[in-house]
UniProtKB/Swiss-Prot annotation:
<protein>
    <recommendedName>
        <fullName>4-coumarate--CoA ligase-like 6</fullName>
        <ecNumber>6.2.1.12</ecNumber>
    </recommendedName>
</protein>
<feature type="binding site">
    <location>
        <position position="498"/>
    </location>
    <ligand>
        <name>CoA</name>
    </ligand>
</feature>
<feature type="binding site">
    <location>
        <position position="232"/>
    </location>
    <ligand>
        <name>ATP</name>
    </ligand>
</feature>
<feature type="region of interest" description="SBD1">
    <location>
        <begin position="320"/>
        <end position="389"/>
    </location>
</feature>
<keyword id="KW-0460">Magnesium</keyword>
<dbReference type="InterPro" id="IPR025110">
    <property type="entry name" value="AMP-bd_C"/>
</dbReference>
<feature type="binding site">
    <location>
        <position position="389"/>
    </location>
    <ligand>
        <name>ATP</name>
    </ligand>
</feature>
<feature type="binding site">
    <location>
        <position position="318"/>
    </location>
    <ligand>
        <name>CoA</name>
    </ligand>
</feature>
<feature type="binding site">
    <location>
        <position position="236"/>
    </location>
    <ligand>
        <name>ATP</name>
    </ligand>
</feature>
<keyword id="KW-0547">Nucleotide-binding</keyword>
<comment type="similarity">
    <text>Belongs to the ATP-dependent AMP-binding enzyme family.</text>
</comment>
<dbReference type="InterPro" id="IPR000873">
    <property type="entry name" value="AMP-dep_synth/lig_dom"/>
</dbReference>
<feature type="binding site">
    <location>
        <position position="367"/>
    </location>
    <ligand>
        <name>(E)-4-coumaroyl-AMP</name>
    </ligand>
</feature>
<feature type="region of interest" description="SBD2">
    <location>
        <begin position="390"/>
        <end position="454"/>
    </location>
</feature>
<feature type="binding site">
    <location>
        <position position="496"/>
    </location>
    <ligand>
        <name>(E)-4-coumaroyl-AMP</name>
    </ligand>
</feature>
<feature type="binding site">
    <location>
        <position position="240"/>
    </location>
    <ligand>
        <name>ATP</name>
    </ligand>
</feature>
<keyword id="KW-0067">ATP-binding</keyword>
Amino acid sequence: MSKRSPPPQPAHIPMAEQRWRPPYPYASSAAGGGGVDRRSRSGFCAATRTFHSLRSVGPLPPEELPLTVAAYAFSLLSSAPPLVVAGRGPALVDAATGIAVSYPAFVARVRFLAGGLWCSLGLRPGDVALVVSPSCLDVAVLYFALMSIGVVVSPANPASTADEYAHQVRLSRPAIAFVAPEVAARLPRHVSRVVIGSEVFDRLASASAAGGWAAPPAVAMKQPSTAALLYSSGTTGRVKAVAITHRNLIAQISAYNAIRETVAREAATDAGKGKPPPPSPSPPAAVTLFPLPLFHVMGFGLLTRTISSGETAVVMRRFDLAAAARAVERYRVTKLSAAPPVVVALTKSDEARRRDLSSLVAIVVGGAPLGREVSQRFATVFPSVQIVQSYGLTESTGPVATMAGPEESAAYGSVGRLAPRVQAKIVDTATGEVLGPGRRGELWIRGPVVMKGYVGDPEATAATITPDGWLKTGDLCYFNEDGYLYVVDRLKELIKYKGYQVPPAELEHILQSRPEIADAAVVPYPDEEAGQLPMAFVVRQPGAYLTEQQVMNCVAKHVAPYKKVRRVAFVNAIPKSPAGKILRRELVLQAMASTSRL
């Protein structure tokens, strides 16, 4: 399975010498907050028409310092809770089996596996490794091992089809793929692969541990170098490979830790005033349950942040509500990271009520906004659990707005305030006017978390990121006078099904390729549990016979399960603008009107 001949023995640098230690003071002016009236709770600067984060910032290493996100994360463990330092606090736990990996063991496994990747497979900085597997402990170790030697991690959904993998391979051009056994046959034949959990995979780490291979040399990666290629759907109907840098991930870790410290400081201040402290989402023994897949930006980013903070990640292979409730009870989970459908399900679950969930103090919600009504219903059922809404994109490496502390968590309907070092604008899409608090427009963001760009697609990159670094989110939003961000609607046409992005154009292309179908359009249909369902409006060819089930089946065999069409309506024509653009809003209103008549 050797990719290249083993390299000559390198000159070794002890791993400890790579570690970044945070002695660097952070200049507050670098946050871009100049001109902001600090008495303004919105963070809006009238002179620049820009919203600035008013949160405290943590140390961030100089951008010119060579540093991988793995080395940065491990460097922070020296300040981790005492249980971690003593080797008793697990880094990872398998939710199903209870197998736990301590922090010393995790760091050792990463280094041993990195040695096998370097010496046996000949992987080098800049190579791309496709990783296709359900979430598991091996995948978490593999991510860090790859990034520690400068190899670009490219996680993909194990539920994707052969056609979808072929497209992703064309984008990322992987040197090798690490795959789950059930996925291997769906990859293009020319891609070299190692099956995760196989004897070959296990030998990569075990041979290093036995001294068979030397440790890899210290890799002097520039922080703006690509660390990961994450896949994001575009409205064109084809996924794009989003280039996330080491700097992006390091900045997210820094922001996460700064917010944790702020919450802890405010709780200590309240305690000094005699106020009863609220439960902390990040106590010394913080344990986070990962029902979201590690290939998703939420799971991928949260893993790096959890490890760097010395917290425990409880990994689920796939989400199941009953299993999640059991895991919370068994492992005393303090924090649950989830998409809105999970919140809805918890409020209705008898299983959740039967379990002891008293350890849970926060549920971190992302992927789509959580409605005020659902938030209030959840608070009624679980009054001691904070809802921590966050907002972000794959293109922003995860959250650019979030909630911190009980006061912010009570702002139902909002997705929180800007994260440290993030700037934002609200832009009128019709006039280009930059708007102030209370005005609705497209959200633009800027900061060290913004992606490098779309791989192999300079036109899409230029259309998404302005020359001065502003990322156009495609979401209709506004800030209120207190700096809370509200997501009103999606300017992008993506359908958000259980936190996944479903591009309607991709489904329309499949439908329109059928000879029995004259025209078709796919729109989001509101659903309390899933968020949105893909609904197809279909125009049959004259004389053609086609049932709703046949329409759903013809799409299902070409796409991953989360992209399936869930509702179908037959119509005489698809409403379009003079330019031929589908008028999706008319179809959504038509769907809602027909439902209300039932």
